[in-house]
Amino acid sequence: MKFFAVLALCIVGAIAHPLTSDEAALVKSSWAQVKHNEVDILYTVFKAYPDIQARFPQFAGKDLDSIKTSGQFATHATRIVSFFSELIALSGSESNLSAIYGLISKMGTDHKNRGITQTQFNEFRTALVSYISSNVSWGDNVAAAWTHALDNVYTAVFQIVTA
């Protein structure tokens, strides 16, 4: 039990540098431009990193272009994008840190139990940022805001995944 208390404190510490209101606004406005493109986002991730697609039993070994139009693919893409949408909606307010922690903790634990590696998390991040930056107005300020946001999330997730 003591271990989990220490882990929780470490995770809270990792997200204790919340986005400023300006950063949160940049992340929220850019996300609003792409969050309805769930299928395209997941397609981009799988296309760039087939090893990630291979981690999903329902998609492993299947032609990406043929599964892109399936209901199963759309459903899973929506789950992933909804997770980010919820985190982003909560960002920018320190009063939401415990809610953010809860979401990140559950996601990190779920993915640790599935054997997802830090490398695969980083691949996902790279593909996600590539998709967003290619589909919104992307300047240094937006890039910095997304880097801060994702650094917070990934620092916390990696503490869980490597524990």
From Swiss-Prot:
Annotated signal peptide: 1-16
Here the disulfide bonds are: none
| Entry keyword Cell cycle | no
Give the residues the record marks as binding heme b.
Answer: H76, H111
UniProt xrefs under InterPro entries? Erythrocruorin, Globin, Globin-like_sf, Globin/Proto, Mb-like_M
**UniProt entry tagged with the keyword S-adenosyl-L-methionine:** no
Give GO cellular component annotations, separated by semicolons: extracellular region; hemoglobin complex
Record keywords: Heme, Iron, Metal-binding, Oxygen transport, Signal, Transport
Q: Any idea where the Globin domain is?
A: 18-162
Record-linked Pfam families: Globin
The molecular function GO annotations come to: heme binding; metal ion binding; oxygen binding; oxygen carrier activity
Q: Which family does it belong to?
A: Belongs to the globin family.
Extra remark beyond the main annotation: There are at least 12 different components in Midge globin.
UniProt cross-references to PANTHER family, sorted A to Z: GLOBIN-LIKE PROTEIN
What is the protein name for this chain? Globin CTT-Z
Q: Which organism is this protein's natural source?
A: Chironomus thummi piger
Q: Which gene encodes it?
A: CTT-Z
